[in-house]
């Protein structure tokens, strides 16, 4: 009964938000927004079974897509075949992620989508333009110490969520899988199209990046410019990327912060920016790090770095523009998120070769 009530409540919320979401030319069809009742999280164990028809032996990237070698039959002396995935193969991966998002609702607010976006963001946001290190190429968050960095707390949920997908499509690298999953989540939660291309290679533990390359939510605008500037972003791009806070919520057992940024944490909209501009925010009185709560309902939260976006003149003009123009936010977020996912990746393909995946129906 309680589960049905929660589902009805979420359906009503999404219904009320739908005009704003669908007003954009990038918007998701109505049936794509699926939210069910929340249950306790449980991770799935990866299968240890081996196949006697397909034994993967290695990976060699060629061109814009990967050429993947495997043994037919699984026996010594068996013939070696080469599989070069096409757009249709990557669409199948997208479809599998989208289906799992629709069926696995035992996470915050009924969707793993926001944490998949965070995984793609954090896997990519370690890039350093000066040294050419970090970025999505490598998926080194699979290993300690990077997996144990404070900014990556809680991302095991996202990595575990994708393990069954990796098992089903063993030819895709973790680097490509994590970024494709982020693109899929944004599209399936009503956001803009995220053009994507393969070509990332996985690395071992030696490729782990040092701690401190990701944003610290307790800081101010100077920190934002230092972190994002290291990756090569300008003020407009910085504000657009932080717009990923349209999705998800903070957790006391991870970042130390608590609560969602807006009333629709599983629907991608420009509400984050509208609330920054239109709502009054005050420091929350609680036994935790400094964060801000909305004056109206006292159920939402903002980081100090979020409030810095409206306190800094250079940032605020972009916040106000996105708050007024959802289409502009969707378009510019898509462009800069694609840029983020590709930082430091030695592609052999052209930008014209990017795929735009068909959304689920």
UniProtKB/Swiss-Prot annotation:
Principal location class: mitochondrion
Cofactor(s) in the UniProt record: heme b
Pfam families: peroxidase
Site, Transition state stabilizer: residue positions: 118
EC number from the UniProt entry: 1.11.1.5
Record keywords, A-Z: Heme, Iron, Metal-binding, Mitochondrion, Oxidoreductase, Peroxidase, Transit peptide
Transit peptide: 1-41
Cellular compartments annotated: Mitochondrion matrix; Mitochondrion intermembrane space
Sample GO molecular function, one term: metal ion binding
CDD domains, alphabetized: ascorbate_peroxidase
GO cellular component terms, semicolon-separated: mitochondrial intermembrane space; mitochondrial matrix
Family of the protein in this entry: Belongs to the peroxidase family. Cytochrome c peroxidase subfamily.
PANTHER family the record matches: CYTOCHROME C PEROXIDASE, MITOCHONDRIAL (PTHR31356:SF58), THYLAKOID LUMENAL 29 KDA PROTEIN, CHLOROPLASTIC-RELATED (PTHR31356)
Descriptive protein name: Cytochrome c peroxidase, mitochondrial
Species whose genome carries this gene: Emericella nidulans (strain FGSC A4 / ATCC 38163 / CBS 112.46 / NRRL 194 / M139)
Gene (name only): ccp1
